Amino acid sequence: MGQEYLLQVQNVTKQYGEKIALNDFSMDICQGEIVALIGENGAVKTTLLNIICGYSKPSAGQVQYKGKNIVANPLITREFGVLIEPQFLDYISAEENLRLLSQLTNQKQDTRIKELLEKTELYSSLKKKVKEFSFGMKQRLGLCQCLLTEVGFLILDEPFVGLDPIGKELFKQTILDMAHKQNVPVLFSSHDLDDVDEICDRVVMISKGNKQLDQPLEHKQTYTVKIECTIFD
């Protein structure tokens, strides 16, 4: 029996006027798999993540989650934990931001909020207004937001940028725990190949809107050569 894919990106194209930003892109992700999306600035990694999350519609092709087209079934993306430019109310505390989000999702999450703030080492700052947070603290609070409800698929855009070494390790361990302990697939974009090498199972590379590589991490030498050829082409 073949692998069952939880998420399928099928021949997705994104076009703005006459400009093709993303060209006929396909990718499949299995349960419990950690996939890194890499590429240079302007490689439309975030564009692809926005399409997968249902924030932007593809010009052609489709994204399926659990066999359902997310454009036709937008409510299914409620199972996604997403960290793409997290949004906060800066004038209230970290705790209040999470409580407000839990009210919007109609779930009482007092215990979960405490667990997440402790896990991300923000508990000592739970009463502090978000406007007083550093960038790294806001990233960690964003992680709390996307894990507040039960997550079936985790999507992170450049999660390690701006983090100190402790923050990086915290994010990496969270990703590993989600995939290996809860069998939740994780898709994250990154520029840092060291971070990619450390935690992911598979590398997918985009360059100039086209998929250039889709390879298991065990073939590291092959994908490193491919990256170098693409960068210096």
Regions of interest found by a model, annotated:
Residues 154-158:
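Catalytic Walker B motif of ABC-type/P-loop ATPase nucleotide-binding domains
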Residues 38-40:
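The feature captures the beta-strand-to-loop junction immediately N-terminal to the Walker
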Residues 53:
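Helix-to-loop junction immediately C-terminal to a conserved catalytic motif
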Residues 172-233:
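ABC transporter nucleotide-binding domain
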Residues 61-76:
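Conserved ABC transporter NBD signature motif
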